[in-house]
Regions:
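Bacterial N-terminal signal peptides that target proteins for export
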Residues: 1-10
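Bacterial Sec-dependent N-terminal signal peptides
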Residues: 15-38
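Boundary/entry segment of secreted carbohydrate-active catalytic domains
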Residues: 35-72
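Hydrophobic faces of well-ordered beta-strands that scaffold small-molecule active sites
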Residues: 45-49, 84-86, 116-120, 170-174, ...
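Short, acidic/polar
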Residues: 59-77, 153-160, 236-248, 307-313
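Substrate-binding cleft and catalytic face of glycoside hydrolase catalytic domains
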Residues: 75-202, 206-233, 299
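Aromatic- and acid-rich polysaccharide-binding/catalytic face
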Residues: 170, 176, 228-232, 239-271, ...
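Substrate-binding cleft of secreted/luminal carbohydrate-active enzymes
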Residues: 290-324
Length: 324
C-alpha cells in the first residue's frame, strides 16, 4: 500500500523492537566500550527503508533517543531491527527503487548484518490493490512475453545483487499486494483478457507469472523464500480466494505475506482477526506467514499498543516468520 506517511513513520515499529538503550559519555578519560554485537537471527523484526536514499538526497537526518544524528540503518539496528525490506520498480522516474538504487541500499544493509526482503512490484511505480500497472516497456506483450519479462527482470535484479556480494536475501516477494493478481491489462476484448494477470479474469496467467518469478528467484538464491503478498490481513476470505485460485492453477509460493493498516476505531478487532488468520492460513496451505507491511498513523496514541499486540501475537505463533 502506498503509505503517504511512510517517511514520517519510518522508525515507528523499530522502537517497539528495542532491546537495549543507548548511552554516551562526555568523560574524555572513560574506558572505550567494546563494540556492540547484535543478534540478527530468529523472528524477523523488519523495516522498509525503500525511500532512504531519496530522503538522504533531500537532506533528511535521523536521530537517536539522545538526539545524536545517526545513519538510519545503524539506528534501526540499535533499536532491535534485524531485517530490511526493499521494493523494486522496473523503470522508475528518477531511478529511485530501480535496480541500481536497490543494490546500493541492499549492500549497505548487508554490511550491518541485516537479513533482506526484496519486494518486486513488476511496475514502474506503486503496485497495490488498486494499481497493478504493466511497466511501460512491457506494454503490448503477449502472455508468454510477459511471463518471460517477469523471469528476466527478477533474475536480472537478483543476479546483480548476488554479483555485488549480497548474500542475505532471505525472502523475495513476487508481486506486491496482489489482491486480484498483477500485471493487469484492462483494455476491452479477448486479446487483453488473454494477457492480463488479473485473477478474476485470468487466474491461470497470474499463476504463470508468479511461477516465472518463483523459478527465477530459486535460480539465483535457491534458499530464499518466495512470498505472495495480499492486503488486509484481517480479511480471511480475500486470502482463501486468492490462494485457492493460485493453488488450482499450479501456482507456487513458500510464504504468505500480509499487510495490515488498522485505524484507531478498529485496531482491536482487525489485529485479532489477523492473528487468527495467520494460524488458519498456515494450517490450510501448509506454509508460513509473514507480516510484510503494517502501519498506523504515527501520531495516534493507539499505534504503540497496536504494534505491541501484533509483535507479541506474531512471536507466539510458530508459523509466523516476522513482522515488517
Amino acid at each position: 500500500m502506498k503509505n503517504i506517511l511512510g517517511k514520517a513513520i519510518l522508525l515507528a515499529s523499530a522502537l517497539l523492537f528495542s532491546i537495549t538503550g543507548t548511552s554516551c559519555s562526555n568523560d574524555d578519560n572513560a574506558t572505550p566500550e567494546k563494540e556492540k554485537t547484535y543478534d540478527m537471527s530468529g523472528f524477523a523484526k523488519g523495516a522498509d527503508v525503500s525511500w532512504l536514499t531519496e530522503m538522504e538526497k533531500d537532506g533528511v537526518k535521523f536521530y537517536n533517543q539522545n538526539g545524536k544524528a545517526t545513519e538510519c540503518m545503524k539506528l534501526l539496528r540499535e533499536e532491535g531491527t534485524n531485517s530490511i525490506r526493499l521494493r523494486v520498480w522496473v523503470n522508475p522516474e528518477g531511478g529511485w527503487c530501480g535496480k541500481d538504487d536497490v543494490i546500493a541500499k541492499a549492500w549497505r544493509a548487508q554490511q550491518l548484518g541485516f537479513r533482506l526482503m526484496i519486494d518486486f512490484h513488476y511496475s514502474d511505480t506503486w503496485a497495490d490493490p488498486a494499481h497493478q500497472t504493466v511497466p511501460a516497456a512491457w506494454q503490448g506483450y503477449t502472455a508468454e512475453q510477459m511471463k518471460q519479462a517477469v523471469a528476466d527482470h527478477t533474475k536480472d535484479v537478483l543476479t546483480a545483487l548476488k554479483d555485488k556480494g549480497v548474500t542475505n536475501v532471505e525472502w523475495v516477494q513476487v508481486g506486491n499486494e496482489t489482491r486480484d493478481g498483477m500485471l493487469w491489462n484492462d483494455a476491452e476484448g479477448d486479446d487483453a483478457k488473454a494477457v492480463t494477470g488479473r485473477v478474476s479474469e485470468n487466474a491461470a496467467n497470474f499463476a504463470a507469472y508468479v511461477n516465472a518469478g518463483y523459478d527465477a528467484v530459486k535460480a539465483v538464491y535457491p534458499q530464499a523464500k518466495v512470498i505472495v503478498h495480499v492486503d488486509e490481513g484481517n480479511n480471511l476470505g480475500r486470502y482463501t480466494w486468492l490462494f485457492g485460485e493460485l493453488k488450482k492453477n499450479g501456482g507456487k509460493w513458500d510464504v504468505i505475506g500480509m499487510s495490515l493498516y488498522p485505524e484507531d476505531n478498529n485496531w482491536q478487532d482487525l489485529t485479532t482477526n489477523c492473528l487468527n488468520n495467520i494460524k488458519t492460513l498456515s494450517e490450510q496451505y501448509n506454509c508460513n506467514v509473514i507480516i510484510s507491511e503494517i502501519g498506523m498513523w504515527w501520531g495516534s496514541d493507539q499505534a504503540a499498543p497496536m504494534m505491541k499486540k501484533m509483535v507479541d501475537g506474531c512471536k507466539a505463533i510458530s508459523t509466523c516468520e516476522g513482522i515488517f
